[in-house]
């Protein structure tokens, strides 16, 4: 199951999650948290509409009653109320694998947009996660570090987030760190591993973070170890970026079919 928002272009959010699940051979269900559209007449600004909390709770109840879930991925929540609704449901469900993509802002938004959800996410969702996949900005927020400039900083951030949450961490450096490679750091309390792939450009690609967390979720559901899941997810996303889709949007979108195309 993914608990995430719908992004109208299909490049990120719940649609990216479901496409990733299908590409990796698992069945996905969806509890929708919000609907994100853009304003093409105003620099593609975000238009976010939350799903009513009772409607969200009804979706979560339906899915948890219908299936014995192997893994749950949590994506865009968007508000303290939504975080509370989802956290309450996850406490009751207690999934074996709960993968948290700690989305604080949508791509293109300013960091200040995260302030009203930051503390709620840390207090209510992070303690429930078994695996967390923060990007550069989210790693700063969750670790309490003032800056992450290189791989050593990213390692420290991953260790801090694990120490505070107990979750396995895959901290994403992506294109934010200098150098020829897109570097992520895996840490589970004992194993520290740097996952690296050559960069494809220097600009973030929409859907990469969503697809990475969804790929981890899919692989865990299939029985992979956390490290195996992280390695496969890294390869999946790297292939999707190599086969990314251009459009009239101010950013490209990852294509989930890239992994199979390169197989």
Question: Predicted regions span which residues?
Answer:
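Charged C-terminal helix
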Residues: 50, 227-263
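Conserved phosphate/ATP/ADP-binding segment of small-molecule kinases
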Residues: 115-192
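Short, small-residue alpha-helix embedded
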Residues: 140-141, 202-226
């Amino acid at each position: 199951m993914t608990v995430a928002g719908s992004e109208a272009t299909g490049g990120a959010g719940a649609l990216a999650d479901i496409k990733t699940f299908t590409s990796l051979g698992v069945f996905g269900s969806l509890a929708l948290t919000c609907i994100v559209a853009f304003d093409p007449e105003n620099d593609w600004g975000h238009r976010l509409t939350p799903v009513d909390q009772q409607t969200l709770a009804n979706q979560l109840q339906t899915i948890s009653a219908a299936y014995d879930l192997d893994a749950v991925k949590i994506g865009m929540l968007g508000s303290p109320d939504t975080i509370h609704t989802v956290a309450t449901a996850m406490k009751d469900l207690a999934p074996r694998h709960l993968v948290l993509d700690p989305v604080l802002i949508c791509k293109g938004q300013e960091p200040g947009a995260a302030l009203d959800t930051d503390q709620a996410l840390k207090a209510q969702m992070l303690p429930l996660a078994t695996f967390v996949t923060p990007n550069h900005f989210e790693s700063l927020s969750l670790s309490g570090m003032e800056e992450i400039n290189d791989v050593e900083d990213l390692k420290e951030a991953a260790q801090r987030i694990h120490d505070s949450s107990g979750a396995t961490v895959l901290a994403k450096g992506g294109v934010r760190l200098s150098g020829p490679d897109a570097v992520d750091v895996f840490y589970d309390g004992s194993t520290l591993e740097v996952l690296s792939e050559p960069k494809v450009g220097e600009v973030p690609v929409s859907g990469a973070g969503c697809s990475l967390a969804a790929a981890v979720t899919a692989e865990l559901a299939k029985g992979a170890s956390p490290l195996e899941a992280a390695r496969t997810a890294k390869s999946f996303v790297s292939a999707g970026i190599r086969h990314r889709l251009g459009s009239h949007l101010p950013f490209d979108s990852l294509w989930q079919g890239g992994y199979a195309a390169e197989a």
